[in-house]
Amino acid sequence: MEVKQIYTLINSVTGEILGKSDILKEDLSNVVDMGKELFSNTDVDNYVKSLVNRVGKTVFVNRKYSGKVPSVLMDAWEFGSVLQKISADLPSATENESWELVNGTSYDPNVFYKPTVSAKFYNSKVTFEVPLSFTEKQVKESFNSASELNAFISMLYNAVEKSMTVKTDSLIMRTINNMIAQTVDGDTMGVRAVNLLKNYNTLKGLSGANVLTANKALTDPEFLKYASMQIALYADRLGTMSTLFNQGGKERFTPKDMLHIVLLSDYAQATKTYLESDTFNNELVKLPTAETVPYWQGSGTSFDFSKTSKINVTISKKNGSSNTKDVTVSGVIGVMFDRDALGVSNLDRRVTTNYNPKAEFFSNWYKFDCGYFNDLNENFVVFYIADTTSGGGGA
């Protein structure tokens, strides 16, 4: 082990923290060990210079990761592959002839009124697997005890679990992203794809140099008040039967216990910092209870809002159609949707194992099958902020 003398450095540090000298440039390269992958020929004792240093403590990077995505998991089933979803349209009202009686008129009670019922079938899955091989005999020589070996193996299993969590979480977010793109692409009226910034500027009569821009919106308390109000209004509106909030034009309502609200962390934290913290009655401007996500598609290389709020995807134009369309949406700050609008169904996780007796190792294949679906006949609303001069949120 290399031992370095740092008395000169520590004396100058003492002077700095006691206020006896100004801030000096400190050479910390001799203080902080950055680690290395393997031992070198200098890793010997400082007495006879030939005894190899021993590992005194082993720390395994074995932290569990639970993920951070909205909960849209549904049930699974063993037999059959198709998810069938059946719905009925609202029947129309007719004349109540009880109050229109005419002498000598026959009133036929035997008319058949056929209900209008439709069914959707979801019959697709996605799949992947994570393979990993394990040895026992070959790796024993690197540890001092069975407990250390078990901790090492446990770390490998945990690495697989973390890998599976990251991958399944990303697919859940892609299910939401696809619905965002479908909604923005299919809404020309701004009812389901709501550009809060455009609506705010219109409401306030702002134009030209006075218009509020997307890069300043999340630090503007007045805009944040307006956005919070609109999101709360939509949460109430979706509880009332309407055809406006789903692309299929179906009569739908979403009760509070079946309403999902997912907000981008940038927006949720901006509301807390710039709005709620400076308001005496913050309950009046507080956002509805919601889940938060740090990004929709990815963080980019900087976690900048322009990256975290953006999705860039290719969507299928119609159910079962091979026609596709590229859609880019920027400035997405939140979504609100019915429990049945999207989901993850028939999830099947399993492990298959094979032992190789010749080379004395075994391999596990961690397999994953699942069905992800969007239903455009259910309520789904997107909230975004985009400068109107840039052409809105979709492309």
PLM region spans:
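Extended, compositionally biased alpha-helical segments that mediate assembly or anchoring
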Residues: 1-62, 277-395
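Alpha-helix boundary/N-cap detector
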Residues: 1-5, 35-47, 147, 151, ...
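Assembly/oligomerization interface modules of large self-assembling protein complexes
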Residues: 48-132
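Intrinsically disordered or highly flexible coil/loop and linker segments, enriched in small
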Residues: 61-65, 162-169, 173, 373, ...
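Short glycine-rich, low-complexity/disordered patches
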Residues: 64-72, 169, 176-177, 181, ...
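Long, contiguous amphipathic alpha-helices that act as assembly "spine/axial" helices in icosahedral shell
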Residues: 118-192, 360-366
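Extended, solvent-exposed, turn-rich assembly/linker loops in the middle of proteins
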Residues: 184-307
